[in-house]
Amino acid sequence: MLNIFSLVCICINSALYSSSFFLGKLPEAYAFLNPIVDFMPVIPLL
């Protein structure tokens, strides 16, 4: 069960990184996604 949860978190994490990469040229969108992108890599390590 923990492995499935970790896999889902990694998928969400990669999706957020790709979306933040495309939205990086928009300062407002990047400022909105920045706290989420900073927090998400911690979740699979828990």
UniProtKB/Swiss-Prot annotation:
Q: What Pfam families is this protein classified in? A: PsbK (PF02533)
GO CC, one annotated term: chloroplast thylakoid membrane
Q: Which keywords does the record carry?
A: Chloroplast, Membrane, Photosynthesis, Photosystem II, Plastid, Reaction center, Thylakoid, Transmembrane, Transmembrane helix
Keyword hit for Ubl conjugation: no
Where does the UniProt entry say this protein principally localizes? plastid
Q: Topology with regard to the membrane?
A: Single-pass membrane protein
Location(s) in or outside the cell: Plastid, Chloroplast thylakoid membrane
Query: Which stretches are tagged as propeptide in the UniProt entry?
Result: 1-24
| Residue ranges of the TM segments | 4-24
Q: Say yes or no: keyword Transmembrane present.
A: yes
GO terms classed as biological process: photosynthesis
Family, according to the entry, reads as follows:
Belongs to the PsbK family.
What subunit structure does UniProt give? PSII is composed of 1 copy each of membrane proteins PsbA, PsbB, PsbC, PsbD, PsbE, PsbF, PsbH, PsbI, PsbJ, PsbK, PsbL, PsbM, PsbT, PsbX, PsbY, PsbZ, Psb30/Ycf12, at least 3 peripheral proteins of the oxygen-evolving complex and a large number of cofactors. It forms dimeric complexes.
Entry function? One of the components of the core complex of photosystem II (PSII). PSII is a light-driven water:plastoquinone oxidoreductase that uses light energy to abstract electrons from H(2)O, generating O(2) and a proton gradient subsequently used for ATP formation. It consists of a core antenna complex that captures photons, and an electron transfer chain that converts photonic excitation into a charge separation.
Q: What is this protein called?
A: Photosystem II reaction center protein K
* Native source organism of the sequence: Pisum sativum (Garden pea)
- Write the lineage as a comma-separated list: Eukaryota, Viridiplantae, Streptophyta, Embryophyta, Tracheophyta
